[in-house]
Amino acid sequence: MVSLLDIIGPVMVGPSSSHTAGACRLGLLARGLVGGTPDSARIELHGSFARTGEGHGTDKAIVAGLMGFRPDDDRIRTALEIAEREGLRYTFGKTTLDEEAHPNTVRISLERGDRAAVMIGSSLGAGRVLVTEIDGFPVEVSGNYHTVVLVAEDVPGSVARIATLLAEDRLNIATLRLTRKKKGGDAFMVIELDEYPDEHVRDHIRGLPWVRWAFRLDKVSA
């Protein structure tokens, strides 16, 4: 079924929902992977993003998202200047990803303190986005839910333990995906939730001995 949002698009600053609203939401999601506004960002644009991104404000929108601005925030127009004042170092480039990549795709490499992350995501239109890769792991993150992402050792019972912790806090899991590159290696878990867990639950998850790191990605859809 086609929704009204699909027809008219989201409330936003800028001329194009794909190049501004979606781009801003990709920046918001990437931001969560390092726990806040990054110290530095390398932003590589693919396809249509690379060809028309600057003219459509894609560059401003992504940087705005990295600073926590929403798609309807008027500060998007001056996001690059704000980033420079705030000390966010950013560079832009063009890249060619594989043939299956959506035309409006970006690879964002971030550093914040001792944390680094690389995310690939696409703007699908009408402000909708899809993250397809995080730190080399294939994922599917829509931004339509509150999301927990974590890297953990591939040990038996890890998924059940985390699901139990969330259930004890009366949280409903919308989707849970686990990806691993090899048996016994690191496993990447993406959990989309209807509500975000309280701080004590997040601390408990981070404190599990086989969890290497865990971060939150806030819901970015309208």
Regions found by a protein language model. Give the residues of each.
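A conserved regulatory-domain signal marking ACT and ACT-like small-molecule sensing domains
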Residues: 90-92, 119-222
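Contiguous domain-boundary segments centered on the initiation and propagation of an alpha-helix
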Residues: 67-113, 123
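Catalytic-loop motifs flanking and including active-site residues across diverse enzymes
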Residues: 22-26, 58, 158
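Short, hydrophobic/aliphatic alpha-helical segments
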Residues: 1-11, 41-43
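Histidine-anchored nucleotide/phosphate-binding helix
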Residues: 27-33
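A structural-propensity feature for long, helix-poor, extended segments
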Residues: 42, 46-85
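Conserved phosphate/anionic-ligand binding catalytic regions in large, soluble enzymes, centered on
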Residues: 9-27
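Non-transmembrane, aqueous-exposed alpha-helical and coiled segments at domain scale
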Residues: 33-42
